[in-house]
Structures are given as C-alpha cells and as structure tokens.
UniProtKB/Swiss-Prot annotation:
<dbReference type="InterPro" id="IPR005870">
    <property type="entry name" value="Cyt_b6/f_cplx_suIV"/>
</dbReference>
<comment type="similarity">
    <text>Belongs to the cytochrome b family. PetD subfamily.</text>
</comment>
<dbReference type="Pfam" id="PF00032">
    <property type="entry name" value="Cytochrom_B_C"/>
</dbReference>
<keyword id="KW-0812">Transmembrane</keyword>
<keyword id="KW-0472">Membrane</keyword>
<feature type="transmembrane region" description="Helical">
    <location>
        <begin position="36"/>
        <end position="56"/>
    </location>
</feature>
<keyword id="KW-0602">Photosynthesis</keyword>
<comment type="function">
    <text>Component of the cytochrome b6-f complex, which mediates electron transfer between photosystem II (PSII) and photosystem I (PSI), cyclic electron flow around PSI, and state transitions.</text>
</comment>
<keyword id="KW-0813">Transport</keyword>
<dbReference type="InterPro" id="IPR036150">
    <property type="entry name" value="Cyt_b/b6_C_sf"/>
</dbReference>
<keyword id="KW-0249">Electron transport</keyword>
<keyword id="KW-0793">Thylakoid</keyword>
<protein>
    <recommendedName>
        <fullName>Cytochrome b6-f complex subunit 4</fullName>
    </recommendedName>
</protein>
<feature type="transmembrane region" description="Helical">
    <location>
        <begin position="131"/>
        <end position="151"/>
    </location>
</feature>
<dbReference type="GO" id="GO:0045158">
    <property type="term" value="F:electron transporter, transferring electrons within cytochrome b6/f complex of photosystem II activity"/>
</dbReference>
<keyword id="KW-0934">Plastid</keyword>
<dbReference type="GO" id="GO:0016491">
    <property type="term" value="F:oxidoreductase activity"/>
</dbReference>
Length: 160
C-alpha cells in the first residue's frame, strides 16, 4: 500500500556512513500518501490561488504607446540580464567581457572536480562550493544593481 525506503542497518558501509553524519536521518517516510496526497495538491492549489489572486488584484495595464521616432536615453535589458549587461558595459574591451562571461560556466564546471575528495552531501561541509555560490550570488546582485546606475557608479554603486 505504501512505498517505504527501509535501510539495511546491518550493512557495514551504511553504518559507517551514518556514523560520520552522512546520509539521511529520516529513513522510512513514505512517499505515498504523504507527498502525493497532501503536499502536491497544496502546492498546486497555492500556485493556482496566487495566479488568480494576482490576476484579480493587479491586472496588467497598458503602457505608453509605442513611438518609433523617440528612443529612450538608455535601453536596459530585462532584469535577469542586468549582471551580464553591466559586466559588458564596465569592461573596456568587449572581448574581455565575453571571455569573463564564458569564465563563469567554466569555473562552475571545475567546482565538482575540486571538491571531488569531499563525499559529504551537506552544503556546510562543502566549503568551496558554498564559497563559490555565495561569492557568485553577491557579485550578481552587486552588478545587477549597478546596471541601473550611470556607468561611472556602476561598479562602486556610488559608495566610493
């Protein structure tokens, strides 16, 4: 009637993992009916309620009429392109900007190989991956905010 993952606690490899703090501490929680009958419908109904609520409370409004002869002073991309837009805008050489953007996925690909010696699944026990994530997040937010400012304040955000 239910699908339960029961560990074999007589397995010495599993016991050694659990003794080191690796693995899960919640073995035996059934996926049926806990997740499929209770959690998923709540998430689906909550998402549906948010969509309906936003459609009723804040309907989309018409913007300014398009004028092909009047362009804005500075054209900004969508918000999710702000960090890369600011990086291309701030770096003096465009090839350097493209190489800097290509270095991001290349750096992310190297993280699992650097931390290959660490077998823990806990992010607090993976200091390199956590440091790369936190540094990248701060960099993206910093450059995203800087994209909305003039180019002379784009890196410093006007602080220095």
């Amino acid at each position: 009637m239910s699908i339960i993952k029961k560990p074999d606690l007589t397995d010495p490899k599993l016991r050694a993992k659990l003794a080191k703090g690796m693995g899960h501490n919640y073995y035996g929680e059934p996926a049926w009916p806990n997740d499929l009958l209770y959690l998923f419908p709540v998430c689906i109904l909550g998402t549906f309620a948010c969509c309906i609520g936003l459609a009723v409370m804040a309907p989309t409004q018409m913007g300014e009429p398009a004028d092909p002869f009047n362009t804005p002073l500075e054209i900004l991309p969508e918000w999710y392109f702000f960090p890369t837009f600011n990086l291309l805008r701030v770096l003096p050489n465009k090839l350097l900007g493209v190489l800097a953007m290509a270095a991001v996925p290349a750096g992310l690909i190297t993280v699992p190989f650097i931390e290959n010696v660490n077998k823990f699944q806990n992010p607090f026990r993976r200091p390199i991956a956590s440091l790369v994530f936190i540094t990248g997040f701060i960099f993206a937010v910093w450059f995203g905010i800087g994209a909305c400012l003039p180019i002379d304040k784009a890196v410093s955000l006007g602080y220095w």
